Amino acid sequence: MREPESRPRLRFDRNELAGAFGDIGTDLPLIIGMIAASGLNSASVLVMFGLMQFLTAFAYGMPMAVQPLKAVAVIVITQHIAPGVLYGGGFSIGVAMLILTITGGIDWLGRVVPRAVVRGLQLGLGLQLSLLALGNYVQRDGASGYVLAAVSFVIIIALLGNRRFPPALFVIALGVVYAIVLKMNVSDIAGSVGFSLPHVQRLSLSEITSGFVLLAIPQIPLSLGNSILATRQIAEDLFPEKRIGVRKLSLTYAAMNLINPWFGGIPTCHGSGGLVGQYTFGARTGGSLIIYGSLFLTLGIFFATGFQHVVQVFPLPVLGVLLLFEGVGLMQLIRGETGNRYEFFIVLVVGLLANGLSYGYAIALVVGTVLYYLCLLYTSPSPRD
């Protein structure tokens, strides 16, 4: 339904408040996982994530949610990427997206990279995340860990798909209570409040280069599909009067990732799921993003020390169950490719290469694309037919 054109760009009421947290169940597990895996500074991550919500609130005047880049998050969590390489990767993603947008290369990339290859990369990410969750995280903490994992699993199954009561929030709350009660002492809790600001970072050429190969190459094709094209379509469906174009989405995507690395922020993007999540619960303006961003700003500026302590002692079995469902969700995206045996074969090859090799995502992208066009050539009817 078309919304009234007189609607303000920013509004603060109970609907905006209700919609503000429509995607927190997806964001928090990835943020916690990245901080834990790479030892990131909590204040920097939280404050910059909050500020990016503000940026898009003012740029769009609608609930254009900001999310962690999923491919980057999965690779960082599973491979324990160093902070400098993460920042270099985020910066290289910003530069690449800016160049692709200005030159029109983003349209070319969308035509050249087959959907089967993108699905294969998602399969590889899902496999890697699920194997890490089951092999490294769920098995930690002995018997108590298995109990926590089982309870978390039951909660998620019971509430799966429930947007009003996102299961991840209840599972995260369980993990936080467990960490505070059983893993933190009085001095940790007493020192959890303080004033913190983001740390300024320096980026080296080697970090930018490594980040480009490890993180940017697998992320950009996925971003093209979910962060740009899918988000533009959903924005057009929900807010047709806004006339949001691919170019503007690409530019704000690039801007976020050109800013974030210098202040210790994680790479971020626009997410079609985040937009739908906030809209579903009532958000109609950028006010929901101001509310959502304020939560992260408050946590980062005043409670970063406490947040860091909680992340350090957060029960890995609980995090493992959350990441397992993230991985399964990524793998489910290949269902639409099962109708064509050649494309399904490419999906499997790309997924296995991405998961099994060093620099696997870059190799899988190239091999999968070449394989796709060879299959296309092989299956095309000859002129004599």
Question: What feature does the model see in each segment?
Answer:
Residues 38-43, 80-86, 161-165, 354-364:
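Transmembrane helix interruption/hinge and helix-loop junction motifs
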Residues 142-147, 167-169, 313-320, 343, ...:
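Loop-to-transmembrane alpha-helix initiation sites
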Residues 57-67, 159-168, 281-286, 332-341:
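Membrane-helix interface "capping/anchor" motifs
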Residues 378-385:
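Conserved small/polar residues in nucleotide/adenosyl-binding loops
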Residues 2-17, 33-55, 215-286:
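Membrane-embedded helical hairpins/re-entrant loop segments and their flanking transmembrane helices
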